[in-house]
Amino acid sequence: MQIRTQTGAVMYEAEFRAYTKANGGPSWDITTTEVLEALGADVVFEGAQATGGTVYQYSQASGVEQVDGKWYTKYILGPVFIDQVVDGVTTTAAEQETAYKATKDAEQAKSVRASRDEKLKDCDWTQVADAPVDKAVWATYRQALRDVTTQTGFPWTITWPVEPQ
């Protein structure tokens, strides 16, 4: 459970107990709403996850917000990039975002290729000389699998070929 103190600090229950004790406050057995109210603190409820965005984004916590008198974890779409200076070298938010997207694209491409390779492996048997199948149909399917990486939208939007029957 997260707790918001009078100062606006947000911490977990164990931290709050230590914080209260370190500041001369009382100790208690079970943390209840009544105990927190007496100590001038509030429970922080889990807020709604952020939705929407792009394939590069995810919901991430960004502080707390008060809604109808209760405190909730606030979520935003991330990641959030900011200009940074490390050892005198500036890396802009745009540069970080470009690098992040390239990494995500590479990860997704690797995953799609692994799926494609698995589909190819699963139908290798169709290319054996004595396989009782229409080799031309299967060869066309297998080539379509190999061509998945050339599709517009790769690696995020894939139209998989239909496996022959």
Which role fits each region the language model picked out?
Residues 1-165:
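A preference for well-ordered globular domain cores
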